Swiss-Prot record:
PANTHER family: MITOCHONDRIAL RIBOSOMAL PROTEIN S5
Record family assignment: Belongs to the universal ribosomal protein uS5 family.
GO CC aspect terms: small ribosomal subunit
Pfam families referenced in this protein's UniProt entry, alphabetically: Ribosomal_S5, Ribosomal_S5_C
InterPro entries, per the entry: Ribosomal_Su5_D2-typ_SF (IPR020568), Ribosomal_uS5 (IPR000851), Ribosomal_uS5_bac-type (IPR005712), Ribosomal_uS5_C (IPR005324), Ribosomal_uS5_N (IPR013810), Ribosomal_uS5_N_CS (IPR018192), Ribsml_uS5_D2-typ_fold_subgr (IPR014721)
Free-text note regarding domains: The N-terminal domain interacts with the head of the 30S subunit; the C-terminal domain interacts with the body and contacts protein S4. The interaction surface between S4 and S5 is involved in control of translational fidelity.
Example of a GO biological process term: translation
GO MF terms, alphabetically ordered: rRNA binding; structural constituent of ribosome
UniProt xrefs under Gene3D superfamilies: 3.30.160.20, 3.30.230.10
Quaternary organization: Part of the 30S ribosomal subunit. Contacts proteins S4 and S8.
Domain S5 DRBM stretches: 11-74
Originating species: Anoxybacillus flavithermus (strain DSM 21510 / WK1)
Superkingdom classification of source: Bacteria
Protein name: Small ribosomal subunit protein uS5
């Protein structure tokens, strides 16, 4: 899979979660901040990243840099996705279903951020299992990676799109 150059895209960033984490040392606890950020151009490109630092702004900056390295392309048909898909990550699972125009993004918290920044404006989703932000974001990204356009499937099967769709 070719890497997507983030400099050619107008990316929008959204901080999904900031978490205070602690390392216990002899003299007490050392606190740091972990940030989870989703970036996307609202036109079929989306990515997520995590960053950890002593201060919140530094953690967010690191997460944004990481997210720009992990961009994926999402096939969009009109305002929705081409077909139903289930994304998995750890104990987190998300069902993504195409929706008719005007439905809007029906998704909870972290998944909503990913879907909106990918440029999908009509979709139904249901999260099952683990609902931690990182698991939900990774499961959503996994689901979006599985999506294929009708042309791609037809080419893989050696058929025409008309034969495929009946």
């Amino acid at each position: 899979m070719r890497r997507i150059d983030p400099n050619k895209l107008e990316l929008e960033e959204r901080v999904v979660a900031v978490n205070r984490v602690a390392k216990v040392v002899k003299g007490g606890r050392r606190f740091r901040f972990a940030a989870l950020v989703v970036v996307g151009d609202k036109n079929g490109h989306v990515g997520f990243g995590t960053g950890k630092a002593q201060e919140v702004p530094d953690a967010i900056r690191k997460a944004i840099e990481d997210a720009k390295k992990n961009l994926i392309t999402v096939p969009i048909v009109g305002t929705t996705i081409p077909h139903e898909v289930i994304g998995h990550f750890g104990a987190g699972e998300i069902i993504l279903k195409p929706a008719s125009e005007g439905t809007g993004v029906i998704a909870g918290g972290p998944a909503r951020a990913v879907l909106e920044l990918a440029g999908i404006s009509d979709i139904l989703s249901k999260s099952i299992g683990s609902n931690t932000p990182i698991n939900m974001v990774r499961a959503t990204i996994d689901g979006l990676k599985q999506l294929k356009r009708a042309e791609e499937v037809a080419k893989l099967r050696g058929k025409t799109v008309e034969e495929l769709l009946g």
